[in-house]
């Protein structure tokens, strides 16, 4: 009888082991973080996404990266899917939160913490790490207009749907008011992705319209890829008198500056610093700590 009872107890214990292990596995499952961006084709955006992903994985989280490829409706769907799939946090990268404000608010209401990197900020988010884009717009515009001798003509290449880029364009408009002898000939929207080739094509067409040297003195680009495309077009056309500036400080831009091309200056953003700041705050929040909410700026540096 004792032997039979012992066998029954052992059998019950063995039956309990799988379910116990399963329950334990569930409780130890890593929290999921979703990264959502429409601009993974951009060198700098890709750099930030990869840096954030690496740091969060190292901190023990599972990371899912969603690239909506410049499709805002797909971006909205990616955020909604991130909530439904059980993400504990969502990071929007290079996104104006106003585009997806409803989805961000719904995510926050569902208990999902939302963060931004090189994005904008709304109250339902935890924070956004970026450069002070308006200040950078002031810096690069002032640099270029002074470099032009405070007179002449220029063209502006931009992409106003991007929250940081549009702030730089606003700053350019304000700075231009202090330079009455400088004229903005035209502003052009640059397609993303394919921004280098599109910018090159835009400038090639401009050079056809303005074939004489001195008809265009400068091209102000709101970020580096358009400046790279503009520089390529100018070099091929032999228009080495036209000044070009950009923002971001990516490797190809710095190389063109060092080679003495039309590309004269850029502002180097600390994208690694932004990524580190976001990854740190995400980790704190998901570990039950509180963080200071709002915009958090990382300084930029002029390279010429």
Task: Please identify what each model-predicted range represents.
Residues 57-68, 154-156, 176-196:
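Short beta-strand elements in bilobed, periplasmic/extracellular small-molecule ligand-binding domains
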